[in-house]
Regions:
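Active-site helix/loop module of the DD-peptidase/beta-lactamase fold
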Residues: 28-34, 38
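Short, well-ordered alpha-helical packing segments
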Residues: 8-9, 24, 44, 129
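Non-catalytic, conformational "gating/processing" segments within enzyme and secreted inhibitor domains
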Residues: 36-199, 215-228
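Generic N-terminal helix/loop capping motif
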Residues: 10, 14-17, 26-30, 46, ...
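Flexible propeptides and autoinhibitory/regulatory segments associated with cysteine proteases
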Residues: 1-23, 107, 111
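Short Gly/aromatic-enriched secondary-structure transition segments
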Residues: 23-27, 142-149, 203-212
Length: 228
């Protein structure tokens, strides 16, 4: 995910020696870390920002200032500010900092994520925080008659009453051990839902899924009518 990629890239920027080299090799296989970082930067700058589809990303660095236990390298701070437009905050790393980080994430994700921390460990001295939000309108909006209450079942078998959206689509997806569908957002983006076959846990399915298989599945959508 892009959010994880950005957080790890900021961490790589602050690393040195073998650690920095190894992180670059993992993040950017087949290319130099410098080239990979440039590609990542171009991807971030090309994210949609239109009326019908908006992708917002925010980076921040939080540094513990209490007791002067940790002094970050100024070159690192300058780099994350200029290269990633990151905000840098000095904070006491107490309950107020926990609240401030959660508030910033909630703000930057349009309220979709309200909490990422419930407490800050005593030994923590820095947080690299990346918040991502994608907000888009359906190309064909649902009307009220297509929204009904039903039971959603979690992987552990527990059920919860939620509002569900119903539709008929012709964009059916199938792959080994899973099936699903696509539904269009505005500005050329798609919502993709995939459901592992019964008896296969989500973690087991994700362990065998790779990027090439996923993209091939999307490219070969079937023109088959299904109810979603």
């Amino acid at each position: 995910p892009l959010s994880v990629m950005m957080a790890l890239e900021m961490a790589r920027t602050g690393a040195d020696g073998d650690t920095k080299q190894q992180m670059g090799a993992v993040l950017y296989p087949g290319m130099s870390a410098e080239d990979g970082s440039m590609v990542l930067g171009r991807i971030c700058k090309s994210l949609p920002d239109a009326e019908g589809a908006r992708f917002h990303m925010s980076d921040s660095v939080w540094v513990k200032t209490a007791d002067d236990v940790f002094v970050p390298d100024e070159n690192f701070l300058d780099t994350v500010k200029t290269a990633y437009d990151a905000e840098v905050f000095g904070a006491p790393f107490d309950e107020t900092t926990c609240r401030d980080i959660n508030r910033l994430v909630e703000q930057e994700t349009d309220g979709m994520i309200t909490e990422i921390l419930d407490q800050i460990p005593e030994l923590a001295v820095m947080y690299l925080v990346n918040a991502v939000a994608f907000d888009a309108e359906w190309e064909t909006p649902y009307d009220e008659s297509q929204i009904q209450d039903a039971t959603f079942y979690a992987e552990d078998g527990s059920g919860q009453e939620v509002s569900m959206m119903y539709d008929t689509t012709y964009r059916y997806l199938t792959m080994e051990h899973a099936e699903g569908f696509c539904r269009a957002y505005k500005e050329g983006y798609d919502f993709v839902a995939l459901l592992p076959e019964e008896g296969l846990s989500l973690s087991e399915w994700l362990e065998e899924l790779d990027g090439e298989t996923f993209h091939e599945t999307i490219r070969q959508e079937n023109d088959t009518m299904i109810e979603t």
